[in-house]
């Protein structure tokens, strides 16, 4: 019997070590590691918060109501992350104290007292006292880590929102590709669009870096309820795709590089949620935009006096070939962020469906080629 008890204590101790080590690594990968990382705990927190808010404000509610609720998604997620980490730290050290011979009740009290630095419980053994010091240091470190990264988070948010706010003057509210191109044509600015493509290519590179290393930024909503970083991204990508495929203008390398930089950035952000999409789509794969919508856009551009190519059918094929690269991830990110309604992005009726738990925890790979 004593042998069995000893085995249980050893197993409990090493299970606690595993939980604590996993939790600490999760915190480091989430806030310190300067690259995208597959952090299961963080992804689970974001998905759970998203599901809860979706129950509070379902898609059937008015957008203004949903916007007020989802404005709290990022703050709740940021608060939920350290809360989840601290809970796991308590459980992990509790198991280690059990492994050192304390009863579960005593282990829980010791672990909670040490983590919160309350100091009302003194462990009976030197090994337990040493563990309590380590636990207190870890608890303070996790809280300090979150606080120290808040300025970094808000600096990245400010960089993201400046071009989004400026886009309203170019593309209207909600932003649309037809408005952006027509307005530039009226003021004689089509030949100066290369500057816009360069600006937004840099913007896409910035959000790829910031929104994959600090995933909470994905859910930070714009100060204006009618603006969204993802609908702005969709407007720019559609504008560049239409410019490259429909307008009778010289080819622009900056335009094409903007499209590629844009869809690569959105794909990297979608990867955080293990969203399945075809990484190598064919140009003729289906997209969420149908031919009649494209024809309506063509007529708008024609009435605005933009120089259009003579072959509309080929222009449609070229546009589809560009759009297919970012269509699924654009709709996914617009859905998961509950973005305001905007043409050809958040107006497609896409609804968020939480992935299976095993996929969320990274224990099973998602399918790679979903239907579009």
Question: Language-model segments: what does each one mean?
Answer:
Residues 4, 58-77:
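Cytosolic juxtamembrane amphipathic/interface segments immediately preceding
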Residues 8-40:
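Transmembrane alpha-helix/interfacial motif
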Residues 9, 69-92, 101, 225-233:
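Transmembrane alpha-helical segments and their cytosolic interface motifs
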Residues 16-23, 78-162, 238:
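Pore domain of cation channels
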Residues 31-60, 159-175:
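Membrane-interface amphipathic/juxtamembrane segments adjacent to transmembrane helices
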Residues 41-56, 108-115, 119, 130, ...:
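Hydrophobic alpha-helical segments of integral membrane proteins
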Residues 162-233, 238-239, 248:
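Non-transmembrane accessory domains of multi-pass membrane transporters/channels
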Residues 196, 218-221, 225-372:
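Soluble C-terminal extramembrane regulatory/interaction domains of multi-pass membrane proteins
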